[in-house]
Structure formats: C-alpha cells, structure tokens
Amino acid sequence: MSDPVFIAPKGGLTLGSVAEACGVPLPDGADPSQPVTGAAPLETAGPSELAYMDNARYGDALATTRALACLVSPRFAPRVPAGTIALVTRDPYRAYAGLLARLYEEAMRPGSLFAAAGVSPGAHVHPQARLEDGVRIDPGAVVGPGAEIGAGTVLGPNAVIGPNVRIGRDCSIGAGTTLTHALVGNRVIVHPGARIGQDGFGFAMGAGGHIKVPQVGRVIIQDDVEIGANTTIDRGASRDTVVGEGTKIDNLVQIAHNVVIGRHCVIVSGVGISGSTTLEDYVVLGGQVGVVGHLRIGMGSQIAGSSNVNRDVPPGSRWGGTPAKPVRTWFREMTTLARLAERSGKDEAEG
C-alpha cells in the first residue's frame, strides 16, 4: 500500500514563474521553462524541487543538495553547489513562504470535506440565518438564528455558530469550533476545537459565596486573523474583547474578557492573557507567557517564553523572566545567580 499524499503541489509552475513570484532575478544561463514540481528541505530536495537556506548551521546540507534551485541570501550565494541555481534574495525564508503558498494552495486554509458549495446533509441552518453565495457547510454544523456568513466561507463538521454572529467572506471555521457573541472579519482562519465568545471568568467574590457577573460584551475579530486549535477567547464583560487585524494566535492560548490585542501581534502556544490587558500593535509573546490583568504591553515589544508579566511594558522592549524585566537585567541576574551557586558549591566542597 502506497503512502497517501494529503496535500499535492500545484502543477504548471516553472523556474521563471517562481522567480518572478518571489521577486528574484534568474541568473544568466538559467532556463526559465524548467518545471518546478515542489519544494523540500535541502537534504531531500530533488532535481525539480526548490529549497531555501538562511542559516549557517545548514552549510553542509547546502553543499550536498540536489535541488533545482535554492533561495539564499547574498552571504551564502557563493556556497551554492554548481548543479543548483542560486536565487539570491535578502529574505530567503519569506520568499520561500510565498513559493509554498503558490505550490500548496490547499494548505493555506482548512477546506471543506465536501467539494461542492452549499449546505451538506446533516447540517442544521436556522431559517432566519443568512448565507451568501458560495458558503460551504459540512455535516453536523449548526448555524443559529440571525447569523450571517459571507461568500466563500467554510464551516467544518460540527462547528456551532451562535445566534446573530457575523462571519465575513473567505473564512475557514474548523471542525468542532464554537463561535458565539462574535463579529468576525474577512479571511479569518479558526482551527479545530477553538472556543470563541463564551463567558468570561467574572465573579464578585465574598465570604458568603461568589456571585456570577453577567458577561454582556462581544468578541471582535478583525480581518486576516488566524486562531489555533483549542484556543479560547472569552467575550467581554461590559466592553468587547478585540483581536486586531493580521494577528496570529497559536494553539492552546487563553484570552480573557475585555482583552484588546492590536494589529499583527504573534501569540505562541500556551499563553494566558488575563482580563482587561491591552497588547499594542506588533507585540510578540513567546510560548507559555503569562500576563496578569489590567496591563499594557507597548507596541513592538517582545516577551521571552515562559515569562510572567506583572507590570506595564514600554513600547519596543524585550523582556523575560519571572517576574518579567528587561532582558539585559534578566541575563545579568541569571549570570550572577549561577556564579553564586558555583562559588557556594566550591565552598561546601572545601569545607
């Protein structure tokens, strides 16, 4: 039995069309009509495939690659072997990503299990819901009353869209997701199992018991956002939870009520953001970062993985540690502690 190919490369691409798409000039003597059948790592790329290289650690792999062509920075271009065409660009990885998007269009967003547009048997769409042309709804999906779904959007199996939810055009809503109390922009990707719009965790604490605070806000997800599998985004308590345009959120992230995330932020898996915190544009949170509530993380700041942020972060900062602080301070503290521990160990041995 042969191994299945889950995502096949698009046919009809040539070296010339690929170079043009990547904005890279072909070197003299290269044949632009040569077919390109795929992309692969340096070690496994064959004579009709492309690879990329932008890290000195892979110098040996570059020297022995059999790839038809390799996207490289000017620094590594002289090391491309004679049998491989050097496609020189300042940002090989970004160019490679653009190439992959052309070769593997199916991998760019989750698709329908059923190729035809329309409502599949076994799906349940309320008569008061409104679907634009070209919407695809897989079996088991539920669309509530008053919901509106834009053209080209796909709902995976068992996805649940609550009453009055708005979903824009060309979105992909993965299998088993729930979307309630939410307004979703265009070209948004939500991976399987995500939960968006459920109650925020709000209680008035007291000795006589904890009184639930009604959560009456919404979730606003702007255009071109991607949300990973099993991520949870709570709706606002009295104002909206917002995820800004172009932000990318990994799997297993928790975003609490009233959080506002700016444009083009990157949030890696395992992050927890407590209520009413604001991330300005282009913030990056590494894996397993914890952010306490009611803070502001300034534009362009980067927080190292496994850090705990318990105070405001100025714009353009690089912080890490628990509690988080500027990375230079954090590194100095870690170095000092290591030296103290080493010295203490020597003293004990001598004693």
Swiss-Prot record:
Pathway field of the UniProt record reads: Bacterial outer membrane biogenesis; LPS lipid A biosynthesis
What does the record give as EC number? Answer: 2.3.1.191
Which residues does UniProt mark as catalytic?
257 (proton acceptor)
Spell out the protein name for this chain.
UDP-3-O-acylglucosamine N-acyltransferase
Q: Which domain of life is it from?
A: Bacteria
Quaternary structure and interacting proteins, as annotated: Homotrimer.
Could you mention a single GO BP entry for this protein? lipid A biosynthetic process
- Catalyses which reaction(s): a UDP-3-O-[(3R)-3-hydroxyacyl]-alpha-D-glucosamine + a (3R)-hydroxyacyl-[ACP] = a UDP-2-N,3-O-bis[(3R)-3-hydroxyacyl]-alpha-D-glucosamine + holo-[ACP] + H(+)
Q: Which family does it belong to?
A: Belongs to the transferase hexapeptide repeat family. LpxD subfamily.
Q: Can you list the GO cellular component terms from the UniProt entry?
A: membrane
Q: Which Pfam families match?
A: Hexapep, LpxD
The GO terms describing molecular function are: N-acyltransferase activity
Sum up the protein's function in the record's words: Catalyzes the N-acylation of UDP-3-O-acylglucosamine using 3-hydroxyacyl-ACP as the acyl donor. Is involved in the biosynthesis of lipid A, a phosphorylated glycolipid that anchors the lipopolysaccharide to the outer membrane of the cell.
Question: What keywords were assigned to this record?
Answer: Acyltransferase, Lipid A biosynthesis, Lipid biosynthesis, Lipid metabolism, Repeat, Transferase
The EC category is transferase
